Structure formats: structure tokens, C-alpha cells
Amino acid sequence: MKGSRTITATPEGSPEAVDLSLIGLPPPMSQRPGSASATRSIFRSMSVATGSEPRKKALEATGPGGPRAINNLRRSNSTTQVNQSWTGSPRPAEPTDFLMLFEGSTSGRRRVASLSKASSEKEATWNVLDEQPRGLALPASAQSPSTLDSALGPRRKECPLAPSFTANNRSNKGAVGNCVTTMVHNHYASSKMVSPPKSSNQTAPSLNNIVKAAAREGGEGSDLGKPRKNLSSASQSARGTTGLLRRREVTEEEAERFIHQVNQAAVTIQRWYRCQVQRRRAGAAALEHLLASKREGQRQRLGGGNLLELHRQEEAARKKAREEKARQARQAAIQVLQQKRAQKASEAEHRRPKDRPETRAPEQPRPMQEPGCVTHPKANNAGASIYPTGPADPCPPASESSPEQWQSPEDKPQDIHSQGEARQDLAVSGSSRGKARARATLDDLLDTLKLLEEEPEPLPHPKAYHKDRYAWTDEEEDANSLTADNLEKFGKLSAAPGPPDDGTLLSEAKLQSIMTFLDEMEKSGQERPAPWRESLVLEAGSGSEGSTSVMRLKLELEEKKQAMALLQRALAQQRDLTVRRVKETEKELTRQLRQQKEQYEATIQRHLSFIDQLIEDKKVLSEKCEAVVAELKHGDQRCRERVAQMQEQHELEIKKLKELMSATEKIRREKWINEKTKKIKEITVRGLEPEIQKLIAKHKQEVRRLRGLHEAELQQREEQAAQRHLRQAEELRQHLDREREVLGQQERERAQQRFEQHLEQEQRALEQQRRRLYNEVAEEKERLGQQAARQRAELEELRQQLEESSAALTRALRAEFERSREEQERRHQMELKALKDQLEAERQAWVASCAKKEEAWLLTRERELKEEIRKGRDQEIELVIHRLEADMTLAKEESERAAESRVKRVRDKYETELSELEQSERKLQERCSELKGRLGEAEGEKERLQSLVRQKEKELEDLRAVNTQMCSERASLAQVVRQEFAEQLAASQEETQRVKVELAELQARQQVELDEVHRRVKTALARKEAAVNSLRKQHEAAVKRADHLEELLEQHKGSSLSSK
């Protein structure tokens, strides 16, 4: 920090030569006191303020002009000569960089404010060396800008130093260095101190003392209460020496070194301050970024948390009530503690001996120190102290650090500083140490309780948990019922208990800090001497209260643990019950599924007999529907074309009607113009200009009215034509829709009738087949019973014959069946191919894709159904065979059971195969006949549809003929109308030409008449102007005459009055 210095050169004989500032650079060699010029006085500018309140003692002690600096200077300045007179002229200006340091931070503002208050309370300045108050009155011109801006700022004074110096005064240099470093470190603990350059007359011990003092003060960290350790030694050395200040000399190099040290200290302070400001800004920016990210995350998390909003509101209300109760309890505890403290203080004051000596050397008892807390006694820089220094102050107990857990980082240095100042006051005033220590202990306890009583600062972004560990104490009434919501809630609490929220009840950290503080107070009270034993009663009371709260919290914790265990057991029971219910439900659902499966299988078996017929009918109906849809689309397309033609014709008609209306309107307009021109001629004959103007306005108004009427009428005609056209188109569309609906309804009815007839036939055939099978089975049973006796005798013969005949017959039947099946398949494939070719030729492109998809699905479904039917038929046949075998075995019984059963199985096998072949042949024949019948029906339907198409085409031709006839008639009518309009148009054009000629003549005549009227008006105006001028002249003459008469009257009056 390099500033400007102010040098005032005075004559040689003057003792005031140079004015050096703390913030300036050392003067050059040509202007120093050791040069050829006369001796000059060196002024040192300091800001000193005093106050009388105990609150400001610490600030005065740490300032550059406080008692500590004074003691250090008094101890070592035995030969300093301070005999210069007070000049009363301070520096004219000083940069505000050094004051900005104190105004930039909160602690600096507090110090400046306290100094301002002190200076306002007691207006006095102190000399640095002799401590005598002197009045200080700074002129307005000598005040700096900082003092002008802030009326409450600290005042400055000038202390002249002695002009003569000695060469070997080493203790003074050490004392000055100690004063500067103490002044700097009492306010700011810097970690770097640059030593000044050595001079020729500087010895190593003094420089080492300065460096050691700076290093020791920097090593003590942020504990700002430690620099007061040298106070007792300084005060004792000052008492040991003579009370009067001795004359001593300060060398030029020591003054330069002092200025350099102050400059270096100011630079270090500003660097430290800027570093702290930058660090604070970076931390604030990082915190803001973190808060923004947390806020965004919380907003995203809380976006879907509306389901538990009501529950959270209830929890917040309960939490608020609980906090209010805790706050009231803490306030009551604080009030009780304050009462006890006041009572104990009064009792201690009464019991303290009144004749206690106050001037004895302060001896501090050694309280119990914490392990790891080391004291650093300060070195004696001057080496002139003859009395032993007292022990350094102990480290602050845990009670001083426990409230810092709830303090902000900005308040901690100020609190530590205030505690250090309090300890310094205890060291200085030994007589009131016991009372002050007890009060400090009680103040710390009161501050701790106040911090606990204060409302906690809400976190900027709460974590994922929003409930504290004790939040469910108020919910015991709601949580007694084992509902699903309560079980889920208690399960979440037991599974992942979140950390407690700050401020609801006493957290574990707060409780631990309070207990540590109480333990430390008990230990320090046990080793404290008798005069301070009485102040421990309040601590014991607070310890009992703390232990009571701990026991209460432990009991609550045990209760909550028991409740949690009970809820966990209930939750396990509920889970077992849920598992059992799930298993029972699964069994019930499995049973229902099995029943439904059986019902569905029975339903499928009932409906399988009708699926083949329905599939075929669906194919036929789909083909017919496709044909009908194609026909309807074709008809719809033709109708759209017809509508488009009719729209074009209507547009032509509307256009012709517009032309006709325009021609008619033109003719009518011409007639109206002729009539109006005649009327105008009659009016212009009269030669009245106002009437002409009125007629022209009326004519324009009439033209506008007629134009509006014409436009309205034309628009109305267009709307009527458009409505008529739309009405005709709507009628045609409705007619087509009705026809299409009628045709579709008829087709649907016929298809429904055919389907019902076919269904009835199939049902009758199925019933007949069922009865026939039952009859055949009964006859077969009877025949087998009759033949049983004969077969017993002829068993051996028939066995071989039956085997041979059955083998031959089987081969013959199988060959015949194969040939017949191949022939039937071939014929069937040919017929199907012919039908498919015919149908594919008639379909459209878009119908083909849909039909292919449908056909593929139907074919797959047909194969599946056929397979299922074949399986079911095989099962039925097997059941019949088993029943027949059982009957045969019962009839044969004993001796021939094996042979009869073998013959029976062979015979039944061949008979069943034969019956199957016969049934399949009959089915194929029936299917072939059915297909032939359907083909005939399809051909008949095709013929009917073709006839219907021919009928529709004939009707269409008739309609076209009628349309052409109407068009021809319309064209002839339009031609006649067009010819008439042409004749009328020619006549109207001739009339228009004639009217135009007459109008031109009328306009020329009107112009002449207007000119005549204009000339007459001009002459009338000229006559009027002449008359007005003559009248004006007469008026002026009359005015002059009246003025003359008034003057004469005045003269006459004056003469009459003078004569009287």
C-alpha cells in the first residue's frame, strides 16, 4: 500500500520541518533529520478514542493507542524526550484505503461504530506517552474526506517526537516493534510478517525479538485473545521502573524502520482482507449454485409428491406445536436460571470481604486445562522486566466452544474476540476476577440456552427425509390401529430413520455439547480456590436440569423402541396374513380357471358342428356383398358425375341470369336518367342555383340508394339460385341413398332367409344322421347277440376265412376308396378353380387384398377345426368300439374269451374302417351336391344382378334423354332471351348517347348561369364593401367629434371650477 506523503518545508530555525504519515514512504536522504539541514520534528499521526463503558475496554486495549501500547512505550522509552509544543495542524489529507479496511467487513464496521460512540460520549484525546487528556479541535479545512463523510469517525491527534536521538538504545526498538505487532495481531492474525531491513546500528536480539513476537502471534491462529499475555509483564516492568518518563533519543533509522513496519502491517492487513473477501465471494457463489441445484432437485422430487401433501401438512402443524412447547419450556428454564443467578450473585456480594486489598499483584489460579491446549508465554522483548510474569490464561473451556456449533462463520471471530477481551479485563482487574469469571460462566450458559431457545434457521433445501426421529411422538393416537398406511409408515421409519431435523427438540449434538460444558464446569469448580466456589451453585443447578432432561429423553427413547418392536411384530403378522390370503386367492382362481376352461371346451364342442357351414356361408355372403358394394360404388360414382354436370349447368344458368339482370338494370337506369334529365332541364329553366345544388345532392343520394338496392337484389338472386342448386343436389343425394339402402336391405333379407333355410336343413340332416346311427348301433347289438351262438361253433373256420377275406376286402376297398377320393378331389379342385377364377375376375384391386387376408385366416381356421373334428370323431368311434368290446366279452365270458375278443377286435376294426369309408363317401357326395347347388344359386344371383344392372342402365339412358331434351330447350330459351336483351341493349345505348348530348348542353348552360351568378355576387360584395367603408369613415369622424366635445366639456368644467 503505497501512498503519498506530505512534506512541509519550513525555515531553518523552525522546529517543525517534516510531517511523516503512517501511510507514506520514508523521506529521501536530502530531507532526513541527519542531513545538513537543521533538526526537524517528526510527527506521527494516530487515531485514538476513549470511552467509559466496560463494553469498550477491549476495543481500547486492542487499538494502537490503548493501555497495552502505552505500557510498552512507557516501559522502554526511558530516554525519550517529549517536550515539543502542540502545533495543532494535522495533515491536510489522507487516503481512505486504511479506513476502508475497517469499513469493508462487519467486524470493522462494529469497531468503527464503537469507536465513534466512545468518541461521542467522551470528547478527549490522549497523548501516547504521558496519557494526559488534551482538547482537540480540528479545523474544517484540515479534516480528511473520511472524517467529513462520517461525523462519528475517530479523531486524530499529532504526537511530536524528540528531535535528538541516541545510538545504542536497543530496548526502545524492541518495545516499538512489540507495540506495532501487538496492534496488528490484536485485530488481524496474519500468517506472514516481513521483517524490516537491518541498519548499521541495529543488533540481532532486538530484530529476533520482533520476528519471534510476530511468529508467535501468527502461530496462535484465530484465537485472538492470546496477544494479551505480555500485558502483566509489561505492567509489572512499568511499575518496577520509575513512574516518570525519561528522556531518550530515537535514531533516524529506527523511525524509518517503524514506518516501514507499519506500512508492511497495513499491506498484510489489506492482502488478508482482500483474500478473505474473495474467499467469501467464492464461497457465496458456490453456496448459491449448490442451493439452486438442490432447489431444482427438490422441485423435481416434490413434483410427484402431491399424494402425501395432506399428511405432511399435519406433520408440520404437529411439529410447530411441539417446537412451541419446547420453546416455552426453554424460556421458563432461562427465567429460573436468571433468578438463581441474581440470587447467588447478591449472596456472593454480601459474603465477599470488604477490606480485601486491591493493589496486590494479580495472581491467577490455574484452572483445569484440557489436554492439547498449550499456553505460549510471550517473550520479553526489552529484557528489562525484573518481576516474574504471571501464567498465561488457560484455554477456553468447552462451554466457550460449544455455542459455536450454532453460530455462523461471520459471528465466530467476533465472539472469540469478545471472549479474549473479557479474559484480558480479568487479567487487568484482579480484584473483581471471581465475580467476572462467575458472570462470564453464567453468561456463557445463558447464551447457550438462548441459542437453543432461538428458532433454528431452516435449511435451504431439505434432504429426502422430512421427518425427525421424534416426529411420531404426537402420532401415537393415530398409530394405535394397525392399518395398512400406519404399518407402511412405521416400516419406513424403522427401515431408514433419517437424521433429526434441527430445532425441534434437543438433538444429540446439542445435548452432548451441553453435557461436555457441564462436566468441564464441575472439574474447574473442584480445583478452583474458595472465593470462587460460590459461583458453582448455578452450574450444579443447570447440571441437574441437564441430567433430568437426559433421563427424560432416555425414557422416551426406550418407550419409542418398545413401540417400534411392537409395530415390527404386528407388521410381521400382517405380512404372514397377507401371504396366506394370497395363496388362498391363487387356489380359488385356479379352480375358477379350471371350471371356465371346462365350460369353454363344452361350448366349443357344441358349436363345432356349425362352423364349417358358417364358414362357407360367410364366403358366399362376402362375395355377394363385395359384388353389391362394387355395384353401389359404381352407381355412386355415376351419381357424382351427374351432380357435377348439374352444378356446371346451374353455374351457367346463374351466369346468364346475372347478365340478364345487369342488362335489365342498365335499361332501367337509362330510363331513370332520362326522366331525371328532363326534371333537371325543367328546374334549370327557372335559374335557381340553390335548387340545382339540392337536386344534385338528391340525385347522388338516389344513385347510391338505387345502387344499394340493385346490389342487394342481385345478392338475393344469387343466394336463391345457390339455395335452389343445393336443394336439388341434396334431393338427388337423398334419392340415391334411399335406393342404395333399399337394395342393401333387400339383399340382407334374402341372405338371411337363405342362411336360415340352410341352417334348418343342416340341423334336420344332423338329427336324421344321429337317429340312423343310434338305430344302426341297436341293430348291430341285436345281430351280434344272435350270431354269438353260431360264432362259438364256427370259430376256428371263420378265423382263417375271415382273415383272408378281410385282408382281400380291405385291399379292394382301400384301392377303390383311393381311386374315388382322388377322382372326387380332382373334380372338386377343378370346380373350385373355375369358381375362384370367375370370382377373381370380377373383384377390384382393393377388395383382392382384404379377401386374401380373410381367406388365409379362414383356411387356417378351417384346418384347425377339421383337425379338432377328426380328433373328436376318432374319440367317439373309440368309445363305441370299447363299449362293443365290453358287450362281446360279457357275452363270451370264459373259455373263448381270448379268441372271441381277438376276432371281435379284428371284425370291429374292419367294420369301423368300412363304415368310416362309407360315411366319408356319403359326406363327399353331399358336399359335392351342396357345392353344385350353391353354384347354381350363385349363377342365378349373377343373372338377377345382371338383369338389375341392365334395368338401371335403361333408366339411366331415359334420364339422359330427358336431360338432353331439357338442355336443348334451355339453350333455345337462352338464345331468345339473349336476342331480346341485345335489342334492348342497342336501344338503351342509343338513348344513352342522346342523353349524354343533352347532358353536355345542360352542363354548358348551367356553367353560363353559374358565371352570371358569380358576377352578380361579386358586384353585390363590392357594393357591400363600399358601404362598410363609408360607414367606418363616418364612425371615425363621429368618434373624433365626440372626443373633441369631451375635451371642450372638460375645459369648461375646469374653468367653471376655477372661477368658483
Swiss-Prot record:
Q: Polar residues bias: where?
A: 1-11, 32-50, 73-88
Q: Where is the composition biased (Basic and acidic residues)?
A: 217-226, 314-327, 344-363, 409-424
Question: What happens biologically when this protein's gene is inactivated, per the record?
Answer: Females grow normally and are healthy. Males display developing sperm flagella abnormalities resulting in infertility. Post-meiotic defects during spermatogenesis with abnormal morphology of elongating and elongated spermatids, including teratozoospermia, premature apoptosis, but without increase in DNA damage. Sperm are immotile with shortened and morphologically abnormal flagella, and altered intraflagellar transport (IFT) and/or intramanchette (IMT) trafficking. Displays normal postnatal multiciliated airway epithelium. Lacks retinal degeneration and kidney cysts formations.
Tell me yes or no: is Zinc among this UniProt entry's keywords. Answer: no
Q: Where is the IQ domain?
A: 263-283
Where in the cell does this protein reside? Cytoplasm, Cytoskeleton, Microtubule organizing center, Centrosome; Cytoplasm, Cytoskeleton, Microtubule organizing center, Centrosome, Centriolar satellite; Cytoplasm, Cytoskeleton, Microtubule organizing center, Centrosome, Centriole; Cytoplasm, Cytoskeleton, Cilium basal body
Annotated spans, Interaction with PLK4: 1-244
- Low complexity: which segments have biased composition? 398-408
Q: How does it assemble?
A: Self-associates. Associates with the centriolar satellite BBSome protein complex Interacts with BBS4; the interaction limits BBS4 availability for association with the BBSome complex, and hence negatively regulates ciliary localization of the BBSome complex. Interacts with MIB1. Interacts with PCM1; the interaction increases in response to ultraviolet light (UV) radiation. Associates with microtubule; association to microtubule is reduced in response to cellular stress, such as UV stimulation, in a process that requires p38 MAP kinase signaling.
Family indicated by similarity: Belongs to the CEP131 family.
Output this protein's name. Answer: Centrosomal protein of 131 kDa
Organism per entry: Mus musculus
